[in-house]
Amino acid sequence: MDTLDELLPREKMLRSGIASLSDVELLALFLRTGTPGKDVMTLAKEILQHFGSLYGLLSADFAQFRGVNGIGLAKFAQLKGIAELARRYYSVRMNEESALLSPEMTREFLQSQLTCEEREIFLVIFLDAQHRVLQHSRLFSGTLNHVEVHPREIVREAIKLNASAVILAHNHPSGCAEPSKADKLITERVIKCCQFMDIRVLDHLIIGRGEYVSFAERGWI
């Protein structure tokens, strides 16, 4: 009987489930074919080694891809499609679920939306009194290391949606999720502004590269 290591990714998935696949095998499953003189498993391994991680791979631009021998526009488009499908899946799920099921679901959604962004994006999730999702919006965009946030605009949008609570989030393209002094100050400003309209700020999450910081989990909110 074949061992799992000897099975092709597709057969291994059918036998043991998608979670049994390594990063290399999962990438090979999506790529489907290799290049002349190179099978798909070898190609997948070389691609991951070149970019260092799945994050590095899925956030790379076409110019970076052209540095990998045998990779063209078709496979670049496939991989960008994977990242976009994941982002849209979580976006649709957030819109269709009747409520936020768990902090994990919220974090997964925010990571899918913000992890690969090359500049800072400030996103707000608006919730009703039962903490059902009303809307999520990218309200502000900035530079590589800064985003200008206007608390009154957050409150204005919350009032328009009749929201009772909000969850704040933004990314750090540098990869480090630790909040800066400016991050803490803007959180305090948003909280104070929301309090005037009886709107609760439930959390502020900072999304880094494979890591996150939750103000609520740290007891700051």
Swiss-Prot record:
Which stretch carries the motif JAMM motif? 170-183
What keyword terms does UniProt attach to this protein? Hydrolase, Metal-binding, Metalloprotease, Protease, Zinc
GO molecular-function terms, A-Z: metal ion binding; metallopeptidase activity
CDD domains assigned: MPN_DUF2466
**Which amino acid positions bind Zn(2+), per UniProt?**
H170, H172, D183
The answer, when asked if Protease is one of the entry's keywords, is: yes
State the Gene Ontology BP annotations.
proteolysis
Where the record annotates domain MPN, the positions are 99-221
Sequence similarity: Belongs to the UPF0758 family. YicR subfamily.
The protein's name is UPF0758 protein YicR
Organism (species)? Salmonella newport (strain SL254)
Q: Which gene encodes it?
A: yicR
